[in-house]
Amino acid sequence: MKTYRRQIREKILQALYTIEIRDTDIDSAAGWLLTEEILADPNAMKFFNMLLKNIKEHMEEIDRYIVKHTFNWDMSRIAIIDKNIIRMALTEILYCEDIPPKVSINEAIEIAKKFNSTDKSSKFVNGILDAIFNDLKNEGKVHKNGRGLIDQSVTKLQKVEGEGENPESAS
């Protein structure tokens, strides 16, 4: 499954781009982009279907987050590719419990570099996603489990540093 995740993200990005420039639905646009390798791998198809389903179901909510964090920008002025990369990453952050947010953000940055709609696409995508992620985390809206847990290493470090210390005896 890991082998195909970036490829699947890129195919879904292409489908999202297609629906913005043509009069078609996302299922049709995504369906013709699938490769035989993806179709033959049940785990890859599971990831594809899950990501596509969540994007479709939550696009309006995702777009509200984007609008809130793109000050002085109208959604129509944001490059189509950049906007859809952000949509996809936010969908993963909010609705894919097993994918760490940092992985979703990093994948979005790498895809932005590859598709490079503008010279500053990867920086724009990174800035918007980072701002939205920080707000979502502060609002308690990011729910992860298993490998998707956030700040796991920080929590472990705090536990180790705090062991055996008595705050009252420190004075």
Swiss-Prot record:
One of its GO terms (cellular component) is cytosol. Involved in transcription antitermination. Required for transcription of ribosomal RNA (rRNA) genes. Binds specifically to the boxA antiterminator sequence of the ribosomal RNA (rrn) operons. Belongs to the NusB family. PANTHER family: ANTITERMINATION NUSB DOMAIN-CONTAINING PROTEIN, N UTILIZATION SUBSTANCE PROTEIN B-RELATED. It comes from the Bacteria. GO terms for molecular function: RNA binding. The gene is nusB. This is Transcription antitermination protein NusB. NCBIfam families: nusB. Pfam families: NusB (PF01029). The keyword Transcription applies. Keywords: RNA-binding, Transcription, Transcription antitermination, Transcription regulation. It comes from Pelodictyon phaeoclathratiforme (strain DSM 5477 / BU-1). InterPro entries: NusB-like_sf (IPR035926), NusB_fam (IPR011605), NusB_RsmB_TIM44 (IPR006027). Disulfide bonds: none annotated.
